[in-house]
């Protein structure tokens, strides 16, 4: 798994780091993860990139010119900053789904941590069968964190 540290993903990244069955590759920039995942796929490995949606936006050129162009199945686990109930980065939140749609990348939204394992398995199978990236948008609730609820 190729990851970039992020406070919202800290618990997930700690799990990745501690899993002996996972090769963890920390990144400096998210688009590096697209190249690393491509290389892993070309030698027969499954790979996922974990990033925030801002990093996903930064990676769009690499996603289009590599993953989509050469039909590389990579699972994109993207923290959904600015999702409903998350008062940070509202512009990023508003643009995340339209950008995925414009790129033709199928995506699913994880809102309950109970669904995580099954959703990841199914998304990985879809990516492999379609030979395309598939994204899972990780919400605060989906990661088991409380949503920010404003007082009215």
Residue ranges and their predicted role:
Residues 1-152:
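Thiamine diphosphate
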């Amino acid at each position: 798994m190729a990851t970039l540290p992020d406070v919202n993903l800290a618990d997930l990244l700690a799990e990745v780091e501690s899993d002996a069955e996972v090769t963890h590759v920390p990144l400096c920039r998210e688009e590096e993860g697209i190249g690393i995942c491509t290389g892993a796929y070309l030698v027969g490995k499954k790979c996922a990139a974990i990033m925030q949606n801002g990093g996903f936006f930064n990676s769009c050129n690499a996603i289009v010119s590599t993953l989509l162009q050469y039909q590389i199945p990579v699972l994109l686990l993207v923290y959904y900053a600015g999702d409903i109930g998350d008062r940070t980065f509202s512009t990023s939140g508003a643009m995340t789904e339209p950008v995925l749609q414009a790129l033709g990348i199928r995506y699913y939204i994880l809102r309950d941590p109970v669904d995580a394992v099954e959703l990841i398995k199914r998304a990985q199978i879809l990516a492999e069968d379609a030979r395309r990236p598939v994204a899972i948008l990780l919400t605060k609730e989906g990661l088991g964190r409380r949503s920010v609820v404003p007082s009215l």
